[in-house]
Curated annotation (Swiss-Prot):
Domain of life where this protein originates: Eukaryota
Primary site of residence: Golgi
InterPro entries registered for this protein in UniProt: SCL35B1-4/HUT1
Membrane topology: Multi-pass membrane protein
UniProt KW keywords: Antiport, Golgi apparatus, Membrane, Transmembrane, Transmembrane helix, Transport
Family stated for the protein in its record: Belongs to the nucleotide-sugar transporter family. SLC35B subfamily.
Transmembrane segments: 5-25, 39-59, 109-129, 153-173, 238-258, 265-285, 299-319, 353-373, 387-407
Catalytic activities: 3'-phosphoadenylyl sulfate(in) + adenosine 3',5'-bisphosphate(out) = 3'-phosphoadenylyl sulfate(out) + adenosine 3',5'-bisphosphate(in)
Subcellular locations according to the entry: Golgi apparatus membrane
Protein name (database record): Adenosine 3'-phospho 5'-phosphosulfate transporter 1
GO terms under cellular component: Golgi membrane; trans-Golgi network
Gene name as annotated: Slc35b2
Biological process terms in GO annotation: 5'-adenylyl sulfate transmembrane transport; chondroitin sulfate proteoglycan biosynthetic process
Classification via PANTHER family: ADENOSINE 3'-PHOSPHO 5'-PHOSPHOSULFATE TRANSPORTER 1, SOLUTE CARRIER FAMILY 35 MEMBER B
């Protein structure tokens, strides 16, 4: 991208960097509270691990360590840098899905209800808690307004730790295909995963949750762009058409919705820049994971590898900033926050397992319909619980977005019915 474009974005964003929380007019306590400063500080922390690691990987590859290496560290270095390429084609086959003996229609309906309920409960609860944690205060009394939790990176760490534990236990308890990918390749998806999650949490300080949900729905556009750039993919005409409808619907919502109590042109700009960052990083994550599935790993193995590096990045960055203990002390001061953060992490981790199971049992089309309905319900709940305003034109924009999403499901289903079904592992979905 042209460097001048980035300069314009940064310069336009600078006036809004001090705005945040419930009072956009109030200046930040210090320049270290600016979201752009925190973002750059986080990136510097991740780079302090990733750059030396990448240089070490390139050095070992140039030195042909795979042929000359010896010693106790050799198996670890081989797994991290070179991977374990299977000797025979049979070894890379994914573990077959086992069909239950009870495959009657009533049993299928029960499984569908179970999957839909699990996805709805997990992600609706996650959405409500996310907005509560990032916009509410803790410890408020009649004489004190309480404290706001501000460290989005600490919340990302909590999510990733529990997801890592859940994925690790699943891999231990259920047989997985032989792992062949070099571990270091997960680090690229982990980095973009962490940055997208940070932008997602941070954006809630500046824009409403319904705005964020619609922004996520519109990420199909940058995903297609990244697919063109990263994977050299081609797309059908209906994909471009529905992407355009989504853009129109989101624009209708953003331009017509009433102002939020804490909003201003400055805070809105900050929120939109953060949402753009979330969409860009998340699009890269999806396409990089698609490329990694060439190693024939399972989705849970992908979940484990990405979350492993995400934990390493966030722990290292928090330690460098001295923020890890401060986040723990905030949890100690406010047990309600500790409970919310734990529930948020549980919903995120088990929601991913529901995603894998639903796609495995019913396919991506059914999963997409369930999640599209979840997004619509999430907007409704957020408006009811937190008092967000939506105008008639804004409501029509929401309807256009979800209509376009359902049209994509219908068109994709018609296209796939004309082809022979080929089982593929879905990319890891994250929140």
């Amino acid at each position: 991208m042209d460097a001048r474009w980035w300069a314009v974005v940064v310069l336009a964003t600078l006036p809004s960097l001090g705005a945040g929380g419930e009072s956009p007019e109030a200046p930040p306590q210090s320049w270290t509270q600016l979201w752009l400063f925190r973002f750059l500080l986080n990136v510097a922390g991740y780079a302090s691990f990733m750059v030396p690691g990448y240089l070490l990987v390139q050095y070992l590859r140039r030195k042909n360590y795979l042929e000359t290496g010896r010693g106790l560290c050799f198996p670890l270095v081989k797994a991290c840098v070179f991977g374990n390429e299977p000797k025979a084609p049979d070894e890379v086959l994914l573990a077959p899905r086992t069909e239950t003996a009870e495959s009657t229609p009533s049993w299928q309906v029960l499984k569908l209800v179970f999957c839909a309920s699990g996805l709805q409960v997990s992600y609706l609860t996650w959405g409500i808690l996310q907005e509560r944690v990032m916009t509410g205060s803790y410890g408020a009394t009649a004489t004190s307004p309480g404290e706001h939790f501000t460290d989005s990176q600490f919340l990302v760490l909590m999510n990733r730790v529990l997801a890592l534990v859940v994925a690790g236990l699943y891999c231990v308890l259920r047989k997985q295909p032989r792992h062949g990918a070099p571990m270091y390749r997960y680090s690229f998806a982990s980095l973009s995963n962490v940055l997208s999650s940070w932008c997602q949490y941070e954006a809630l300080k500046f824009v409403s949750f319904p705005t964020q949900v619609l922004a996520k729905a519109s990420k199909v556009i940058p995903v297609m762009m990244m697919g063109k750039l990263v994977s050299r993919r081609s797309y059908e005409h209906w994909e471009y058409l529905t992407a355009g409808l989504i853009s129109i619907g989101v624009s209708m919502f953003l331009l017509s919705s009433g102002p939020e109590p804490r909003s201003s042109p400055a805070t809105t700009l900050s929120g939109l820049v953060l949402l753009a960052g979330y969409i860009a990083f998340d699009s890269f994550t999806s396409n990089w994971q698609d490329a990694l599935f060439a190693y024939k790993m399972s989705s849970v193995q992908m979940m484990f590898g990405v979350n492993l590096f995400s934990c390493l990045f966030t722990v290292g960055s928090l330690l460098e900033q001295g923020a890890l203990l401060e986040g723990a002390r905030f949890m100690g001061r406010h047990s309600e926050f500790a409970l919310h953060a734990l529930l948020l992490s549980i919903c995120s981790a088990f929601g991913q397992l529901f995603i894998f199971y639903t796609i495995g049992q019913f396919g991506a089309a059914v999963f997409t319909i369930i999640m599209t309905l979840r997004q619509a319900i999430a907007i409704l709940l957020s408006c009811l619980l937190y008092g967000h305003t939506v105008t008639v034109v804004g409501g029509l924009g929401v309807a256009v977005v979800f209509t376009a999403l359902l049209l994509r499901v219908y068109a994709r289903g018609r296209k796939q019915r004309g082809k022979k079904a080929v089982p593929t592992e879905p990319p890891v979905q994250k929140v």
